Swiss-Prot record:
The lineage of its organism: Bacteria, Bacillati, Actinomycetota, Actinomycetes, Mycobacteriales. Keywords: Methyltransferase, S-adenosyl-L-methionine, Transferase. The keyword Transferase applies. This is Putative S-adenosyl-L-methionine-dependent methyltransferase MSMEG_1481/MSMEI_1445. Belongs to the UPF0677 family. GO terms for molecular function: methyltransferase activity. GO terms for biological process: methylation. It is an enzyme of class 2 (transferase). Exhibits S-adenosyl-L-methionine-dependent methyltransferase activity. Its EC number is 2.1.1.-.
Length: 304
């Protein structure tokens, strides 16, 4: 179903289901030899959501072969590197003395529970109310305890989330570490700019931001999402990923941030893979455009 300006979701539908998909990838990546990440909660969170395809995937109860196996392997590889990149970003920010962090569109992100946060750190998680409620309940049932002071902000990012964040105790005078992981493709172009404007307005000097940017969203990612959805529909996952992503001309995230008071650093995706000792996968195995996907970049920025 195509997106609307007022659509909402839980963790088993629409955009929320992609959070479950990513958690499934983290769960599998955590069990690999020489794993890049360790997310001990991902598999249990996926099971709590109850989407049969992803539950079977993390439990090893589904046999994938050919293109299906290649697509799943690609997803796991991509998510392992992406997760580690954002993990390291938070750890580096904490090492620099930042004690206030914000996870935008937190989904099933478990960093507030699994990273070794310094004493006194506050982690804010922002997402839709049903998503926040479900994850909080699931973590309690699992018996997980946050490793930082976790504060939830149950609000749609299309609403006045800065006001809700402040109401939860956020201090705009204190440097903050922000992540927008896997988020920008789910925003219309103007909403992406508005997100960065709000982050900038809330960021004291020395604040840090990490995100990722895909220059060719329309022709590459939407086609990739449609192909992946078609493969997985046969296994019972009936969400068309290509319907969830917004195309259209948009400002390059790195250039926009640089023009709004941030010192920006970018790394192409293959370079990020290499930094973690991994080889960027051959995307032609799943019908993707290698050249276009190699142009996607990981962004880190510091408020000047």
């Amino acid at each position: 179903m195509a997106r609307t300006d007022t659509d909402s979701w839980d963790l088993a539908s629409s955009v929320g289901a992609t959070a479950t998909m990513v958690a499934a990838a983290r769960a599998i990546a955590s069990t690999e030899p020489n794993a890049l990440i360790d997310d001990p909660y991902a598999a249990d969170l996926v099971r709590k959501v109850g989407l049969e395809f992803f539950t079977k995937l993390v439990d090893g109860d589904i046999a994938l072969d050919g293109d299906d196996a290649a697509a799943a392997g690609l997803m796991v590889s991509m998510m392992a590197v992406r997760t580690r990149f954002f993990d390291d970003f938070f750890c580096d920010a904490a090492g620099a003395g930042i004690r206030q962090s914000v996870i935008l569109a937190a989904g099933l992100d478990s960093r507030a529970y699994r990273l070794g946060w310094p004493a006194g750190t506050v982690v804010y998680e922002i997402d839709q109310p049903r998503v926040i409620e479900a994850k909080t309940a699931a973590m309690a049932e699992i018996g997980a305890s946050p490793t930082a002071e976790r504060r939830t902000v149950a609000v749609d990012l299309r609403d006045d989330w800065p006001a809700a964040l402040r109401a939860a105790g956020f201090d705009a005078a204190t440097p903050t570490a922000w992540i927008a992981e896997g988020l920008l493709v789910y925003l219309p172009p103007e909403a992406q700019d508005r997100l960065f404007d709000n982050i900038t307005a809330l960021s004291a000097r020395g604040s840090r931001l990490a995100t990722e940017y895909h220059p060719d969203i329309t022709s590459t990612l939407r086609g990739r999402g449609q192909a992946m959805s078609e493969r997985w529909r046969d296994h019972g996952f009936d969400v068309d990923l290509s319907d969830l992503w917004y195309g259209g001309d948009r400002n390059a995230a790195d250039e926009y941030l640089a023009g709004h008071g941030w010192q920006v650093s970018t790394r192409p995706r293959p370079e990020v893979f290499a930094a973690y000792g991994r080889t960027f996968p051959d995307l032609t195995l799943t019908g993707d455009d290698n050249a276009a996907m190699r142009q996607s970049v990981a962004i880190t920025a510091t408020r000047s």
